Amino acid sequence: LDQGRYTVAAGATGLVRACRDASVKYATERKTFGVTIGQHQLVKEMIAQMESDYQASRLLWLRSGWLKNQGNRNTRETGLAKWFATVASERAAGDAVQIHGANGYSDEYPVGRFYRNCKGGVIYEGTREIHKLMQADYLLGNRVDKEPRCALPAYREVLKAR
């Protein structure tokens, strides 16, 4: 499951970035009351949240991948990256649609598609609720990972074999 969760975290992180980029572009072009909507405080807040979520999601999944490349078990870290990034993607997609207003539902802009696509990541490879429980169990000492039945070699070992 770790590999799938890692992939979901990476995809969700990309979705946060796409929502951020589309929202920044729209906020600098769309005008209301004589100013771009990016000048409005709550639009700024939503865009700032997207940036924060993107940076945190990116660091979590990169750390998870780094651990895997070192040959270390990364179930805890991958679960956290998947949980955080998918929740962030759902929030970013909702905010992106909000920033775009009625245009958020239009096929002219990609954010409506982002909003539809984000939900899958929240559900598959373990729902957000399952990942919350897993993280709590790690902290409370109720969960300890067993040795994997089989594992891919560390990436550095793959490079040495070439």
Predicted regions and their residues:
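Alpha-helical interface subdomain recognition
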Residues: L1-R162
